[in-house]
């Protein structure tokens, strides 16, 4: 007997930074927001289950559940009982404070990674300016 088609789980892997000082549930939310903003996560894509994320990251399922619940309240995710959790079909607008917070976090991470690779701040600024179209 042929099994019914199950929704295909889209590949999305969360990663945690234990040294960032950012709470784990907040890191999960930030990653989904960044994925949506960048287009890496599109409307309708299925996220891993709470249990799967908890096992993969070796964290408490309640932490994942809290993040998913908050994202659902914000309109980022839709949970369908018995089917899974999906990226919502609506465009999300972020407040000025949220955008500044995200930019600060991304910039800090970028500068840290580039510094570890041996790049100076001056080199980074030049590279960023070179990316900007005239």
Language model segments and positions:
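Extreme N-terminal segment that seeds HTH/winged-HTH DNA-binding domains in transcriptional regulators
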Residues: 1-46, 101, 111-134
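Residues at secondary-structure transition points
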Residues: 19-23, 27, 58, 62, ...
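Beta-hairpin "wing" of winged helix-turn-helix
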Residues: 40-45, 72-82, 86-90
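A short alpha-helical element within helix-turn-helix/winged-helix DNA-binding domains
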Residues: 46-57, 71
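Short, cationic-aromatic polyanion-contact patches
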Residues: 49, 83-100
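Residue cluster at the C-terminal edge of the helix-turn-helix DNA-binding motif
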Residues: 56, 73-76, 117
């Amino acid at each position: 007997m042929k099994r019914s088609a199950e929704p295909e789980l889209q590949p999305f892997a969360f990663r945690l930074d234990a040294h960032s000082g950012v709470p784990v549930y907040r890191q999960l939310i930030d990653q989904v927001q960044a994925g949506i903003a960048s287009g890496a996560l599109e409307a309708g894509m299925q996220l891993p289950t709470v249990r799967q994320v908890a096992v993969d990251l070796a964290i408490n399922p309640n932490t994942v559940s809290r993040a998913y619940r908050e994202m659902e309240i914000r309109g980022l995710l839709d949970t369908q009982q018995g089917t899974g959790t999906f990226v919502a079909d609506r465009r999300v607008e972020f407040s000025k404070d949220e955008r500044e917070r995200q930019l600060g976090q991304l910039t800090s991470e970028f500068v840290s990674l580039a510094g570890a690779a041996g790049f100076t701040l001056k080199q980074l600024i030049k590279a960023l300016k070179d990316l900007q179209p005239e």
